[in-house]
Amino acid sequence: MTNIHHHKILILDFGSQYTQLIARRVREIGVYCELWAWDVTEEQIREFNPTGIILSGGPESTTEANSPRAPEYVFNAGVPVLGICYGMQTMAMQLGGLTETSTHREFGYAEVSLRNPTALFDHLNDDATTSQTTLDVWMSHGDKVTRLPDNFQITGMTSTCPIAAMSDESRRFYGVQFHPEVTHTKCGQKLLQNFVVDICGCETNWTAENIIEDAVARIKAQVGGDEVILGLSGGVDSSVTALLLHRAIGKNLHCVFVDNGLLRLNEGDQVMEMFGDKFGLNIIRVEAEDRFLEALKGIDEPEAKRKTIGKVFVDVFDDEAKKLTDVKWLAQGTIYPDVIESAASKTGKAHVIKSHHNVGGLPDYMKLGLVEPLRELFKDEVRKIGLALGLPAEMLNRHPFPGPGLGVRVLGEIKKEYCDLLRKADAIFIEELHKADWYYKVSQAFSVFLPVKSVGVMGDGRKYDWVISLRAVETIDFMTAHWANLPYDLLGKISNRIINEVNSISRVVYDISGKPPATIEWE
């Protein structure tokens, strides 16, 4: 079996908004990497034994006395090092160079003129349509390197930044003031590939097939012949987790699907058909709509609704788990960004905006071991694994759906009547987006039930009924988002269908709020 962790890159995070993007780009090349805080110890680096190290960008200034620094061992480990933006600046400072606050800050596109030859820039411009002497890049910096460390050479410059890239070829140390990880930088992925594959010598073994083989082997080694329980929601993470476990241990996997009454139209039946009938998984379906709605009576505050939904889910899951007396392990669809977020929260710097629906767990007395086969994977990698395991692309590429489901898309108190109306309206919205070839052009689209009544006219009579809001956004990372500029005729068609086909809806509105200041979900 291929050792997918034999060659690996360590990325030290100095706080850049793009740091996770660096890791995803390295993974796309086919090499495993991990993301650690900048203040890691020498012992931890030695234990990880990286094939190469990348220093990320960050918001701090190297001219400040207490700004973050890379561990000195990074430059004594005998492996190649690439510094990006702040990472280049701290490399220069720590190795004897000088950085200063620039009088001309660079944010956005810039043209880098290539200077002395460097392995980092080899064959970047194989495409004959691109220049052989310049690179179009994305800059985001206020400081700049003004004096090189000993044995370094300038490999790139801009009109306002004389040292935009540098290298010490003998020690295989490289720095770039721009961000190769963002798509705005042309040839950025090829630059990272030069570093990871050609300079560090990593083999590209991080593929979907190898990851599946490794995950199955590790599950077998971890749980042996024991039985495992998994909460299956039908979402991407739990679905891929279920199929990996099923491949590894077969009928020893018990999936519990809790139908809480807060799902999309016909979603419960679709989950059972997909995983029970098609894939042959052992699934227990729990009809718990009444239990959830009873617990949610009178609760209209969003955070209280989330907490209640989470608590009831744990209680329902606990009741089913008690019936399976031989279960020794709990499986969860934890993915790598969850691991990173959890680690970051321990620093005390995190500010809670909304509680995450996966936070929490089963009662302590259950004493189950934890199986998390996706904890090394980013979301896009999970989708690739799912595709390789046979899940349909349309399911894997569905828009995100919140853990509390319609519980955060019905504003205020949740009632069955409201959920039923919202389900039908949302199904029409999504159906029309598909028909108009707009579904995959937007990042997320959904309907929201507003518990306010508005006057309308139906035939010769007036009616006083509920309001539905449509929400569609375009985003790269879900940290910021723009409302989608859907065609007016499409919005009109959707509105007419909802008002005519869903009883008790008198008005449809379109949400044109960006993030920030609004969040994507209404609650």
From Swiss-Prot:
Residues of the active site: 85, 179, 181
Domain Glutamine amidotransferase type-1, chain residue ranges per copy: 8-205
Record key words, sorted: ATP-binding, Glutamine amidotransferase, GMP biosynthesis, Ligase, Nucleotide-binding, Purine biosynthesis
One Pfam family here: GMP_synt_C
Catalytic activities: XMP + L-glutamine + ATP + H2O = GMP + L-glutamate + AMP + diphosphate + 2 H(+)
EC number per UniProt: 6.3.5.2
NCBIfam families for this protein: guaA_Cterm, guaA_Nterm, PRK00074.1
UniProt name for this protein: GMP synthase [glutamine-hydrolyzing]
Organism listed in the record: Histophilus somni (strain 129Pt) (Haemophilus somnus)
